[in-house]
From Swiss-Prot:
Residues 28-119 form a propeptide. Optimum pH is 10.7. Thermostable. Highly active at 75-80 degrees Celsius. Residues 126-405 form the Peptidase S8 domain. The gene is hly. Residues 1-27 form the signal peptide. This is Halolysin. The keyword Cell inner membrane does not apply. Transmembrane segments: none annotated. Keywords: Hydrolase, Protease, Secreted, Serine protease, Signal, Zymogen. It is found in: Secreted. It comes from the Archaea. GO terms for biological process: proteolysis.
Length: 530
């Protein structure tokens, strides 16, 4: 069971979740896009997920399109269609389309195409100016291996300057242009300007040339792929990012790094991460750079390792997000790496911490090539070093390359789906009743976990058939709003349901909101223990 396997936008999301993903995995990797589609940010698009094949569902979606809205992109593997609205279309028109299209039996969800933003001692001459490889104990690992070029790390980010003096030796030459471009769709992920530097910096941290007498030392000498999903302005649409993740997995990437976030929960992006995880990729992502905020997506998905940032003194960076999803910490403050054009600079952010973990994962797999992605994930956790921070700040601890490479994984444990396991018999059920109308359009609730070892929770709403009420949920106790939430269910009518897996660190915030009509409702929370 996975904490984020399906977002419960409607009851059929719960009923069809497993079969839908099975359909995704069995389809060919065919995508199509309309020429002239917006680059990078795609704020005028709505993404519609389907349970059947895209080709079979396209006519249904076409029939729901309002005037001047068009299908501009499809992805058969992940099972979604992108619909573009005119820029002057009202918010109400977009919301009405979402609700209308959700009436179709073969439609699973509809969501905005949100924007995510860019988050032995070697002989490299700038190694003395670095601290990140030393902090994560790379020198002990380098006595065993510098990394196997047969292990591939895909960087879903801005483009990488693949002919950079300190990167070209580690770029994966088995793929045309060492990657692909999902922003311009021209097949070449090369940066368009010197200011498009985030991807080159991230790639250099994970797998810049090490012990090559040039530039700085990357964490590993594994192979790099560039999956350009963020434009030169630093932003990218969820569909471009989802396509890049799927493509990376289809290329056989062992590790996928995502130093990006900020767009909120997306079912499309969740499906892409789950697809890649099931293909055998280890996914690593930046926790986010808004200290005090919860871990951003995609790092917060169960299929992804969320990484927080440490400064040189192994204290939590002032910008690093934190929360129960954090699995590992790594250096992210003032990290030296490559930038265009054959230059070097120091950047700060969880965007820098994430590729440190990705690089360590790469050469851990070089030393222990038989590990599955789940076993590799567990091994990185088990060999991490406690630096005295809370679990919400450091997760299992600071990643340690030396320990990960030199420690025998044994039988590896792990395996299977993330968060697998079944809930037990312990149950706690709470109910509340209320009435909402134009004079009282919403009610807010909070729920504190009650079972000894929480496993899952289902929040359900039952209201009048003549009204339309919606249900919003947060997992950190903050009061949800219609624009700030972690889960949402919004069918026609007033019967809604949201199910979530629990780690034990959550506190539920609940909002019952009037979309139209009025009347009484019953809210039920059922919590299951392990």
């Amino acid at each position: 069971m996975s904490r984020d396997t399906k977002r419960n936008i409607g009851r059929r999301s719960v009923l069809k979740a497993t079969s839908a993903l099975g359909a995704f995995l069995g389809l060919g990797g065919v995508t199509s896009a309309t020429p002239g589609r917006s680059r990078s940010r795609k704020k005028d698009e709505i993404v519609v997920g389907v349970s059947d094949s895209v080709s079979a569902s396209k006519a249904t979606i076409d029939s729901k399109l309002p005037s001047k809205a068009t299908i501009v992109h499809t992805n058969e593997t992940l099972g979604y269609v992108a619909v573009e609205f005119p820029s002057r279309a009202s918010t109400q028109a977009r919301e009405n389309f979402k609700r209308n299209v959700l009436e179709a039996d073969d439609v699973e969800y509809a969501e905005d195409n949100a924007t995510y933003e860019a988050i032995a001692t070697p002989n490299d001459p700038q190694y003395g100016q670095q601290y990140a490889p030393q902090q994560v104990n790379c020198e002990a690992a380098w006595d065993v291996t510098y990394g196997d070029p047969g292990v591939t790390i895909s960087v879903v980010d801005q483009g990488i300057q693949y002919d950079h003096e300190d990167l070209e030796g580690n770029m994966d030459g088995s793929v045309s242009n060492y990657g692909d471009d999902f922003v311009d769709n021209d097949g070449d992920p090369y940066p368009v300007s010197a200011s498009e530097n985030h991807g080159t910096h991230v790639g250099g941290i994970a797998a810049g040339g090490t012990n090559n007498a040039t530039g700085h030392a990357g964490i590993s000498n594994c192979s790099l792929l560039s999956a350009r999903a963020l434009g030169d302005g630093g932003g990218g649409s969820l569909t471009d990012i989802a396509d890049a993740i799927q493509w990376s997995a289809d290329q056989g990437a062992d590790v996928i790094n995502m130093s990006l976030g900020g767009g909120g929960f997306s079912q499309t992006l969740s499906n892409a991460c789950e697809y890649a995880y099931n293909q055998g990729s280890l996914l690593v992502a930046a926790a986010g750079n808004g200290y005090g905020n919860s871990v951003s997506y995609p790092a917060a998905y169960d299929t992804v390792m969320a990484v927080s940032s440490l400064d040189e003194g192994e204290t939590l960076s002032a910008f690093s997000n934190l929360g129960p999803e954090i699995e590992l910490a790594a250096p992210g403050g003032n990290v030296l790496s490559s930038i265009p054009w054959d230059n070097y600079d120091t950047f700060s952010g969880t965007s820098m911490a994430s590729p440190v973990v990705a690089g360590v994962a790469g050469f851990t797999l070089s030393a222990h090539p038989n590990l599955s992605n789940a076993e590799l994930r567990s091994h990185l956790q088990n060999t991490a070093v406690d630096v005295g921070l809370s679990s919400e700040e450091q997760g299992h601890g600071r990643v340690d390359a030396g320990q990960a490479v030199t420690t025998d994984p044994g039988d590896g444990g792990g395996g299977g789906d993330p968060g697998d396991g079944t809930c037990g018999d312990e149950t706690n059920t709470e109910t509340a009743e209320g009435n909402i109308s134009s004079s009282n359009p919403s009610d807010a609730y909070s729920y504190t976990l009650d079972t000894a070892d929480p496993c899952s929770a289902t929040v359900s709403l039952s209201g009048p058939s003549s009204a339309d009420f919606d249900l919003y949920l947060t997992l950190d106790g903050r009061t949800p709003t219609t624009s700030d939430y972690d889960r949402r269910s919004y069918n026609w009518g007033s019967d809604e349901e949201i199910s979530v897996d629990l780690s034990g660190n959550e506190e539920l915030g609940i909002l019952v909101n009037q979309y139209s009509g009025s009347g009484s409702y019953t809210l039920t929370i059922e919590e299951l223990g392990k």
